[in-house]
């Protein structure tokens, strides 16, 4: 398997990632199954403080592994603070994970329940590190907000994204995408679970403070089908759809999951 060819297929999927990225078998890998009976409420966890500047959204691209919406992270325009975090974490990008059918697709699992999809909003510690790339190698470098998507009502907040997918259908395509506030994709309750973990895609670096929101948002079956119409192949290659892009839960290995709520 060539270094750049990891994916979600039979021959390059998550069970093969350790061949190129040995940390795949590390002690702080993500995602995990959250077992609510084993979670501890922690009264020291603060509420989340989130301020995003819609004008800092820049481009949407097809990485071949998902779509990414990238933000201008040259200054603290869009930041996540509070919760389990110390200092400011600057918004870098968000992307989505889904499955080949509506009954699975989320990366984190809660008491055996798999949601249809999972949004990841990625931030980096701009108080301590000069760039995302450097922060990604430090244990307190990244903070990822995870939001579950559950099949239900059509979600108008996703429309701007689904409407533009045709212009980034092939891997490597990108287009301008601005005036978007990811806050509109968060549920009304910001109750969360938190634990130390990793990126869920290679290079799988163990530098993430995970903040997984308990309350899901809705997505219709038709909207979710739009994401499966993206290709994991570039223009000129034999076309293959990105039907599924989620990593299964990894062993907890003694880590503690804390809750901000009873």
From Swiss-Prot:
Keywords: Lyase, Metal-binding, Zinc. GO terms for cellular component: cytosol; intracellular membrane-bounded organelle; myelin sheath. Reversible hydration of carbon dioxide. Residues 4-261 form the Alpha-carbonic anhydrase domain. Substrate binds at residues 200-201. Belongs to the alpha-carbonic anhydrase family. SUPFAM superfamilies: Carbonic anhydrase. PANTHER family: CARBONIC ANHYDRASE (PTHR18952), CARBONIC ANHYDRASE 13 (PTHR18952:SF81). The keyword Isomerase does not apply. Its cofactor is Zn(2+). Disulfide bonds: none annotated. Gene3D superfamilies: Alpha carbonic anhydrase (3.10.200.10). Coiled coil: none annotated. This is Carbonic anhydrase 13. It is an enzyme of class 4 (lyase). GO terms for molecular function: carbonate dehydratase activity; zinc ion binding. SMART domains: Carb_anhydrase.
